[in-house]
Amino acid sequence: MSRGLGDVYKRQVVKLKETKTYLREFYFIPDSVPAYQENDIMMAVSYLDRLAKERDMPLVICIALGSNMGNRGKDGQLATYLDIVSRRRKRCSVAAVGNEANARHHFLGKIQPDMEYESVEVSVEENIPGFFIEMWANAPELYAVSVSSPTGEVLPKVPYRSGGRQEFVFIFEQTRVSIDYRLTGRRQGNQLIYLRFSNAAQGIWTINVYPQSIVTGDYNMWLPMRNFTSGNVFFLRSNPNHTITVPGNAGQVISTGGYNVANGCLYLDSGRGFTLSGEVKPDFCAPAVNVYGPGLRNRFVTMTGTSAAAAITAGACAQIMEWGLVKRNQIFMSSADIKNMLIRGADRADDRSYPNPSWGYGTLDVYGAFEDLRR
């Protein structure tokens, strides 16, 4: 038993096992960086859900993890599963939106009808063993790509074919590039183009994107998250929007951005929305800069990042669940009920428009949420 978030609550921590070695090697993730598989995270959530059911207790799940990989639409496996769990009575899920807004790891593409192709430039520093890029386009858009090396050698346009794959080794750079085309998801059929650069040479790499069948001409590219590459890799013309990490894009999950309480300013690295489907994310922002709290080995530490904001938000959700379910003020309560309650009570500045891609519906205000119930 612990005290602090509510009068009395029980804390359950699930330790995830590290990802398999062959996956680290495939995605070029350094050994020193913690990384976990999506299916293991889903198993952890399932375990907590079963445990809460056995004990007939409300459950707040805090996920302070994120990824730039995977489907950003409604077909992502982890996001879909969290939505299912969050719809259940006495369940609430909170996720951080990530710290990728200023990492220059997102490119927002737009091909006009009169354009033959659009060029996307990627800067790669020296001694990079490899990296990958995921390009996503919502159905019915279809694209094909070609790649130019820093010395000007060109991998010609690889024609689109679902399930098609091509590999090419650049002569001077000795960089191996593989390109895979996929149509993903059970409901949407969005296009994924996966580009993997092995033994990546230093310099500016150019990816030319060719329209095959377009309506809007919109597409997005993402590089791996910070620390998931062994050096600095970024888009020269990056875009800070649509940088919410998975599963912060899940519809039923309470997605928390971050801000600095000391000056009221946005935490600049806080992931920004909206989602690719236009859904408002983040839902709101919580303190994320120099947050003081318990750490390992019975010590208190200072933390910065949206993971800290998610932890604070999870505590607020526990307070609301205690008020509603334990004290029986609102016995039918789910993640959506808590989210709407916090959104209605959020503090909103007069000089900003809402909903906002950076701030969502404002900043977390638990007192304001309860005050709103009195009106």
Describe each model-derived feature in a short phrase.
Residues V14-K15, V45-G73, A96-V97, Q212:
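Short acidic, glycine-rich surface-loop motifs adjacent to enzyme active sites
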Residues V13-T19, A52-R55, L142-Y143, W205, ...:
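Hydrolase catalytic cores
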Residues I61, L78-L108, L364-V366:
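Catalytic cores of secreted or luminal carbohydrate-active enzymes
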